[in-house]
A protein has these predicted regions:
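His/Asp/Glu-rich, glycine-adjacent segments
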Residues: 32, 42-189, 193, 263-360
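A long, amphipathic alpha-helix that forms part
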Residues: 179-181, 193, 354-389
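Segments forming glycine/polar-rich beta-alpha architectures that bind adenosine-containing cofactors
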Residues: 208-263
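Metal-dependent active-site segment of extracytoplasmic phospho-/sulfohydrolases and closely related
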Residues: 229-230, 377-407
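Short secondary-structure boundary/capping segments
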Residues: 245-252, 359-364, 399-413
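Acidic, Ser/Thr-rich peripheral helices and adjacent loops at domain boundaries
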Residues: 283-287, 407-419, 423
Length: 428
């Protein structure tokens, strides 16, 4: 080993020298040197023979990370997922050399470990009888699986731009296992349980009993507030992303943050959900001459350009704004828009907008949406002196990397001509 070539009195200096080089401006020069040494001494092949426990604390050579990841990914591909080992390995490697170069791969296997832990907790499957209890379980526990899956695909998507010849094919094999665990086990079994449990209540009442309804949002949350109310409506901002936002707001703002849910109106598309969040006594549907559907609140159009009017019909001191309009404004301009207002609706569109570009952009857009909504909250608190803020959505979304099978799809005509009724979609 190298310790035989270095005098004892120089070991500390040599260690500091290499450590500073690793994090210094010329680190890329060191990478080239180390890669040459790896090839010359066939270190990759040698390290593959070393037990994982002995490699975890080893740094300096970049190929150590690749050897560790290769072993773990190979085991995952062979259905061997040691949850504790993976979590401990990732946490240990975070602080060592060259982690940033392969961070997305480590983050990917970390999410696999979390998904496997969830699977082990619920290996008996989902067999809850009452729909309201499934709802409760999802909003308190099951949503975590959606978060793990989203974070996994954020990491996997990053790997497609970073690239590593030794890891990329293995990562794709791991992705196949993730799809099986999430799409076929989690969505499949939980979806079947939910469909069976809610069928009778939906048929008899058109909603899930004892679950808050989206159509009641304004009357229950906004109408009777004594103080000025701000409502941020983020298009397609689903429940599990809201849970991540809530956690960050608690940590960063030291505010009282609570997370709730409600059943969205059916079908869960923008025009229906946006209408449900506006004040109304009755929602109705008008079919235009071109076949498009228009949603009316007490006879008034709820299209984007008319929402300010709908709000003012209930409370004249109300205003509807768009984040993309107020974001570039000066503080004084923004403040003038909300001066004297009791109810302020701020519409935000990041996730849904991304879905119109590419499905693969939806998960990255969730992180962007979180940051933008935190900025809206900052504006409300610091510039508008707001203390009561609701963050909600018109609908959520369901995304899988692997395409849905034909029997998972619904004929569009079934949606267009079905009377609006509550749907099993949660939101903040």
């Amino acid at each position: 080993g190298s310790e035989m070539c270095i005098r004892d009195r120089h070991q500390a200096w040599c260690y500091d020298f290499v450590s500073e080089w690793i994090v210094g401006e010329n680190r890329q020069d060191l990478v080239e040197i180390l890669r040459n040494v790896e090839e010359e001494l066939i270190l990759r092949k040698r390290f593959k023979q070393v037990p994982l426990d002995d490699l975890v604390g080893t740094e300096v050579f970049p190929c150590v990370n690749e050897c560790i990841l290769t072993q773990i990914m190979t085991e995952i591909s062979n259905h061997i997922i040691n949850v504790d080992m993976i979590i401990n390995t990732v946490e240990k490697r975070r602080t060592l050399a060259w982690y940033d170069d392969v961070e997305c791969y480590y983050e990917g296997i970390l999410q696999v470990a979390k998904m496997q832990a969830f699977f082990l907790e619920h290996s008996a499957g989902f067999h809850t009888v009452e729909a309201r209890n499934i709802w409760k379980e999802y909003t308190e526990d099951y949503y975590r699986m959606d978060t793990y899956y989203r974070h996994y695909h954020l990491a996997f998507g990053k790997s497609l731009t970073v690239g590593n010849d030794h890891l990329d094919d293995l990562f794709k094999q791991v992705t196949d296992k993730v799809e099986g665990l999430y799409t076929h086990w989690f969505l499949g079994e939980l979806g079947n349980n939910w469909s069976d449990a809610c069928a009778d209540e939906l048929a008899q009442y058109g909603r899930i009993l004892l679950v808050p309804q989206q159509v009641d949002f304004y009357n229950q949350k906004v109408k009777n507030e004594d103080n000025r109310v701000f409502v941020i409506i983020s298009d397609a901002f689903r429940y599990e992303v809201a849970a991540s936002l809530a956690e960050q707001l608690r940590r960063e703002t030291q505010s009282k943050v609570s997370l709730g849910s409600c059943a969205g109106i059916f079908p869960t598309v923008t025009k229906f959900g946006m209408a449900a969040l506006l004040p109304h006594k009755q929602l109705s549907i008008n079919e235009r001459s071109n076949g498009d559907l228009q949603i009316l609140a007490d006879g008034m159009s709820t299209d984007a350009g008319n929402r300010d009017k709908v709000l003012k019909a209930t409370n004249s001191n109300s205003v509807a704004l768009k984040y993309k309009d107020i974001a570039p404004m000066r503080r004084a301009e923004r403040s003038a828009l909300v001066k004297g207002m009791d109810v302020v609706y701020i519409y935000h569109d990041k996730v849904d907008e991304a879905s119109h570009t590419s499905d693969s952009m939806v998960f990255p857009a969730c992180d962007d949406a979180i940051e933008e909504i935190k900025n809206i909250v900052r504006i409300i608190r610091n510039e508008f002196s707001g203390t009561r803020v609701y963050i909600t959505a018109d609908h959520g979304f369901l995304y899988t990397y692997s395409p849905l099978s034909e029997d998972s799809k619904v004929d569009k005509t079934c949606l267009l001509y079905t009377s609006p009724s509550p749907r099993d979609r949660t939101r903040s």
